[in-house]
């Protein structure tokens, strides 16, 4: 299949592009930033005309201080890009079979167990951002099938969130728990994320919202201690929330308040996680060059 992808050069996009190309035999068509500038709508329409699937991963990094300017960038890089994809799809005569649009578990309330059937959403900027992002994606025209994926923290030692956590651990041999440590830490291994995306492409009956998180729910402390053990940390320290609030301001809530999320619909659909637990995640800490299973 021809698969158009925003965010193809990002951490998730690179892994997913390689997986879908090498394991699925698909052709990836990157949709770069230039294609979403004003006056480029014709080129976007022309590109989507030849695509079977669209995967929308676009979005500026969330894990930095949320200044008014960065909040606007977070909004524009997600909602504005999604809006222009939908506008282009409405102009395409032969619609793609599937659109997969990313979101995040930040949609849900903090500290309350949630799944795709949960009716309430969280409070604050992150939940509002996810809500607006998904609302725009839901304007996807028929007959294109729409899947919305709410990502947890995506993990692999070669990049992303884990690389940021490993950098100070390797330098100091101290595993730092983000206080209080009891907050949920919803996570998914990059290999399972890639397999889940292929699962959506292959199973045409699947549509709607899916949580992309591992079935094992852990706290921030449990995860950090397991990581410290795997990477031979000398000790584990709890860093007070106030430190992160000073560093990140409002964005500290991304680290200090977590969502307890279950992948209920994915499990109901028959998806089997290759990395369902943190014990499995840290079994082989040297998988910098990932071996992605075919199924």
PLM features per residue range, with description:
Residues 4-19:
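N-terminal Rossmann NAD(P)H-binding glycine-rich loop of SDR-like oxidoreductase domains
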Residues 83-124:
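Conserved Rossmann-fold NAD(P)-dependent oxidoreductase catalytic core, especially the SDR/UDP-sugar
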Residues 124, 131, 141, 145-148, ...:
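NAD(P)-dependent short-chain dehydrogenase/reductase
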Residues 166-175, 183-217:
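Alpha-helical substrate-binding/gating segment
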